[in-house]
Amino acid sequence: MFAKKMTIAGLACLLAVEASGCGNTGGGQVTSIRIGVSVYDQYDTFVSEMINHFNEYASEVSASMDTNVSVNIDVYNAAASQTTQNNQVKTMLEDGCDIICVNLVDRTEPVTIIDMAEKKDVPVIFFNRELVEQDLERWDKLYYVGAKAFESGIMQGEMAADIFKNDPAADKNGDGVFQYIVLEGEADHQDAIVRTEYAVSTITDQGVPVEKLGYAIANWNRAQANTKMSQLLTEYGDQIELVLSNNDDMALGAVDAMKAAGIDQAEWPVILGIDGTDVGLAALKNGEIRGTVYNDKEGQAEKMFDLAFCLARGLPLDDLGLEGGKYIRQPYTKLEEVPEEQE
């Protein structure tokens, strides 16, 4: 799961190309594929790592199998602007991209992109930031690759409850209640809301009483989380026993704030993240955070490429694990230590 690999689905898809020699559904043999990718923010650590692996995997596939098909990938940064992203998709379509992959800026505003792609008959793979189900049903060439946000919240909550029950030092004031703060991704963002809601409800379902001291929206960003955590430390100080962060970058922002405040690491609250980014795993290894929930960026990147390749070649999608013909979801993994393959 954590090491680079070529998925069985990808191999099956490419072997089908070799066996059949088929081109796309239009009848002409495909000799090149152009994939356009728009990310909501290139500085988002998880998204950046996922796209890096997407490119690496595409190169691995091209080098390891004689497909007689060249793959070109154009990556655009929407810089947190839906208008910019819409214009980027327009450019990709005008430039002749065969497949569009979109990491939506605003999950509630995909219609412009969908309409443009449908007019050009170019399939769209949305990824990581899940659009509303009804929008994905607007056309039969729309797909989503990602994970189920609630699963990460449940796993984060399970880790928090387990730590509280098994580490007496986690209950710093000894009152039998886990006092916590939340670092939330975005205001009114479905994934952020779901991760927080399920994390907290899971802790209480595990029989651990909690008290919410405060929360801050830090937009998935480490620097913003540093600022927000510093403010929360000023207000609540050592009352904070648990930091529930919607992603690793914000968890690391909390770490930065603790260091800036000169607080000894032994006195830090329990800090938990989500994503299992490279920097997040490094912080887990050295004990700065107590746990993270691994969001399989490698698996998602590979599945997205497999899907894009098969769509562009007009190949069957049977081996790709699509749910309802639309969704590919990779499972999360709970991590309280770094796996050996990441050492």
Predicted features by range, described:
Residues 1-34, 65-66, 93, 115-120, ...:
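Short, low-complexity disordered leader/linker segments with a strong preference
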Residues 29, 85, 143-176, 225-226, ...:
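Hydrophobic alpha-helical segments within soluble ligand-binding/sensing domains
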Residues 31, 176-187, 191, 202, ...:
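Hinge/cleft segment of the Venus flytrap/periplasmic-binding protein
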Residues 34-61, 74-87, 97, 103-108, ...:
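Extracytoplasmic "Venus flytrap"
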Residues 46-65, 152-156, 190-209, 224, ...:
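Short, solvent-exposed amphipathic alpha-helices that sit
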Residues 61-78, 179-182, 204-222:
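Short beta-strand elements in bilobed, periplasmic/extracellular small-molecule ligand-binding domains
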Residues 90, 99-119, 124, 199, ...:
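Hydrophobic alpha-helical
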Residues 113-151, 170-177, 277-285:
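Flexible loop/hinge segments that line or gate small-molecule binding clefts
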